[in-house]
């Protein structure tokens, strides 16, 4: 027997098994009225009520429903209320400007747009058939108690469209099917051990890969979900303490905020020997990994993936064989991107690009057949990342292919140089880029944010690197910055950091 896998399965199970359990804790500090604490039974009723409200608006199945919001119970409701009854949720990055959001709304063909109240002034003029401000206005969609129009489940139907951040071009809309999301949720849940004794904290933006798919995995297992509107280190620790949080996800920048807050925390760090933190978005330095385990007492788990892969491709979680390792030795092993998740096949092509196959890799890019064909050429998904896979199956990223620095004919991995600089106690953030050089083609430049009141010079950091890595890999110059350009999910925007140095150069390499 075979039945279609759709995300309504997760919602139906939560209602049946955990209907009386508080499943959603809404953000109390938000411009809209908080929905408070919702049981999974109430959450189901809201989601179905939203589907019924969309019926009343005349939206056909397959219609797109956009939402631009920070983390909230209403955003979670939209992910299920739109998709679980046959429509398509389009969660949009709330940090984008009006032109960018308008492009996404227009390109995806949204019939409905729900806006965070803080964004009404900047995004309120975007043309769309039905616009609602999140809160009392959008709550008019919730026809609680009404039966939504039946939908014949189709696991190959598009459930969400998630727009990837563009570099030189417009962003692409990643189509995720119900099967994609279902597979990612199940596999993510297996590997991270999601169970009904967990409490999950939404530190990830829920627009980003649908909160990496955790809303589906946690809902299916009846896990209470705590919303957090804005990342703030001290507040994260407070909520972990208040709600008994056991699981959270984030980029390395979130880890840094938590470590900074922990240094000022009075008393034992909340969640010690209980919290599992899943990190992705950039390869974290080994020093950071070690600090998570020694200073916080939390388990560090690294994953690797992309929006196009829902996102889980690989996972690196401490193994029994590593139990007797020193924290530093274990951190070094955890700094790799990990082994393929269940159902994922990985390979590299002759140029070193990482390739992948699996059930949760995108259906296609929305209305972009050329990009879809390129990304899925030869029945592999082409990640655009360069890496190596060892005999045990562990992937180690070398760099984004376009970020490899070639100096004097030698390839330099910016990740390796960044990891070296991160180990210096004065360095809080760093980005390593290649800049044009008449003699060498490119030379290595480090852009550094110094932590606190630390006093360090350009010469100090260059000499520090020369003691640790091959001289040809070391920066020839260091520039100190107050901050580094990042995406909403914490990734360094190296194309922005490189651009000023390559102005007037015909190609982006020398």
Residue ranges and their predicted role:
Residues 4, 19-22, 146-163, 170, ...:
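Conserved pre-ATP/AMP-binding loop-to-beta segment of ANL
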Residues 3, 23-72, 76-80, 97-102:
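Conserved AMP-binding/adenylate-forming core of the ANL superfamily
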Residues 182-199, 207-247, 261-262, 318:
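Conserved AMP-binding/adenylation subdomain of ANL enzymes
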Residues 37-42, 159-183:
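Conserved AMP-binding A3 loop
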Residues 96, 248, 358, 363-364, ...:
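AMP-binding/adenylate-forming catalytic core of the ANL superfamily
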Residues 470-491, 510:
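AMP-binding/adenylate-forming catalytic domain of the ANL superfamily
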Residues 27-36, 118-155, 262, 328-330:
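ANL superfamily adenylate-forming
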Residues 223, 277, 284-303, 307-395, ...:
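Conserved AMP-binding/adenylate-forming
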């Amino acid at each position: 027997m075979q039945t279609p896998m759709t995300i309504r399965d997760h919602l139906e199970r939560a209602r049946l098994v955990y209907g009386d359990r508080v499943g959603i804790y809404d953000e109390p500090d938000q411009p809209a009225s908080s929905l408070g604490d919702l049981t999974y039974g109430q959450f189901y009723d809201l989601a179905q009520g939203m589907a019924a409200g969309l019926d009343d608006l005349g939206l056909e199945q397959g219609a797109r429903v956009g939402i631009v919001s920070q983390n909230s119970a209403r955003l979670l409701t939209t992910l299920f209320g739109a998709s679980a009854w046959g429509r398509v949720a389009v969660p949009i990055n709330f940090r984008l400007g009006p032109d960018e959001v308008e492009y996404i709304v227009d390109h995806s063909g949204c019939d409905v747009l729900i806006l965070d109240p803080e964004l009404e002034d900047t995004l309120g003029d975007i043309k769309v058939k039905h616009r609602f401000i999140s809160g009392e206005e959008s709550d008019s969609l919730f026809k609680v108690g009404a039966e939504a129009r039946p939908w014949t489940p189709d696991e190959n139907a598009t459930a969400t469209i998630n727009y990837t951040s563009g570099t030189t071009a417009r962003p692409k809309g990643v189509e995720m099917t119900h099967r994609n999301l279902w597979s990612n949720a199940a596999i993510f849940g297996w590997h991270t051990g999601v169970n009904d004794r967990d409490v999950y904290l939404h530190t990830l933006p829920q627009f980003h890969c649908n909160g990496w798919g955790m809303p589906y995995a946690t809902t299916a297992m009846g896990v209470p979900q705590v919303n957090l509107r804005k990342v703030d280190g001290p507040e994260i620790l407070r909520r972990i303490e208040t709600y008994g949080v056991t699981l959270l996800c984030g980029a390395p920048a979130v880890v840094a905020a938590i470590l900074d807050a922990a240094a000022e925390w009075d008393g034992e760090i909340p969640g010690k020997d209980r919290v599992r933190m899943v990190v992705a978005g950039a390869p974290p330095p080994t020093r950071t990994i070690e600090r998570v385990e020694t200073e916080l007492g939390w388990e560090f788990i690294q994953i690797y993936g992309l929006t196009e892969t829902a996102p889980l491709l690989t996972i690196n979680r401490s193994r029994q064989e590593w139990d007797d390792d020193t924290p530093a030795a274990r951190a070094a092993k955890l700094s790799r991107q990990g082994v393929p998740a269940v159902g994922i096949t990985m390979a590299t092509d002759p140029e070193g690009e990482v390739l992948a196959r699996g059930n949760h890799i995108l259906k296609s890019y929305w209305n972009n057949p050329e990009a879809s064909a390129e990304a899925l050429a030869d029945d592999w998904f082409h990640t655009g990342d360069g890496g190596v896979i060892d005999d045990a199956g562990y992937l180690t990223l070398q760099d984004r292919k376009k970020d490899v620095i070639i100096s004097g004919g030698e390839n330099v991995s910016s990740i390796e140089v960044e990891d070296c600089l991160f180990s210096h106690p004065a360095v809080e953030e760093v980005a390593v880029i290649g800049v044009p050089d008449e003699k060498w083609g490119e030379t290595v430049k480090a852009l550094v944010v110094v932590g606190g009141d630390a006093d360090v010079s350009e010469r100090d950091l260059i000499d520090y690197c020369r003691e640790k890595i091959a001289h040809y890999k070391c920066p020839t110059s260091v520039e100190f910055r107050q901050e580094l350009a990042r995406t909403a999910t914490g990734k360094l925007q190296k194309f922005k950091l490189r651009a000023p140095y390559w102005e007037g150069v015909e190609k982006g390499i020398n």
